[in-house]
């Protein structure tokens, strides 16, 4: 399936409040984008390429995700027992690890321990991960603007009866155009995985 079809489905799911489906489609789009960008082999440390794409571009994701803190090596409380072995001594996990875990769970159609908010939220409390829906937009923009996806094309996409097809189609593989739209965003990939202690 084309990356553009996953983006269309993610967009529609997000509009209907089906966040697990939106994350599942975004994970599949990220997988294909990472395969196109890095090839089929993982990186030197054995990290899969989808994880690599998220890790290297986490600061871009955060800066496109409305009102989120932009920090290298951002950690949040570990939201699930299966992530505890990747947590530090204080029980905190790197955000990119949590996002990848969440998206994989969505793709596997597993329950997501998430409370979604329309206002800017990022944290773990009352046994749930709290996130704002702006995450899906940030991921969509990252995927669409990757050079590896420059040959993608959407047929039709509407928001509240208004076509956004032309705008999205202008962004495929065009990070430069998005940089003009969001000049305050962080655009340089971070080799975060190689700098962690």
Language model feature labels by segment:
Residues 179-197:
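Extreme N-terminal leader/anchor segments
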Residues 1-24, 39-42:
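Charged alpha-helical initiation segments
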Residues 97, 112-183:
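Amphipathic, Lys/Arg-enriched alpha-helical patches that create a basic surface
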Residues 75-120:
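Histidine-centered, metal-coordinating catalytic motifs and their short helical/loop contexts
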Residues 35-86:
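Flexible secondary-structure boundary motifs
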Residues 30-31:
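Amphipathic alpha-helical segments of tetratricopeptide repeats
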Residues 57, 61-72, 78, 106-110, ...:
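Short, flexible helical or helix-coil boundary motifs
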């Amino acid at each position: 399936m084309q990356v553009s079809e996953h983006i269309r489905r993610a967009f529609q799911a997000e509009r209907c409040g089906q966040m697990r489906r939106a994350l599942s489609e975004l994970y599949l789009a990220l997988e294909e984008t990472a395969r196109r960008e890095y090839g089929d082999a993982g990186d030197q440390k054995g990290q899969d390429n989808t994880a690599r794409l998220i890790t290297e571009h986490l600061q871009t994701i955060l800066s496109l995700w409305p009102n989120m803190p932009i920090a290298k090596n951002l950690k949040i409380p570990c939201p699930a027992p299966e992530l505890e072995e990747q947590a530090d001594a204080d029980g905190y996990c790197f955000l990119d690890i949590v996002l990848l875990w969440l998206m994989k769970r969505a793709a596997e159609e597993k329950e997501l321990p998430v409370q979604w908010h329309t206002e800017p939220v990022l944290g773990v409390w009352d046994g749930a991960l709290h996130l704002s829906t702006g995450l899906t937009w940030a991921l969509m923009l990252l995927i669409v603007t990757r050079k590896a996806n420059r040959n993608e094309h959407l047929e039709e996409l509407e928001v509240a009866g208004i076509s956004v097809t032309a705008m999205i189609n202008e962004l495929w593989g065009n990070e430069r155009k998005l940089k003009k739209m969001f000049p305050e965003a962080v655009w340089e990939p971070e080799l975060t995985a190689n700098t962690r202690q």
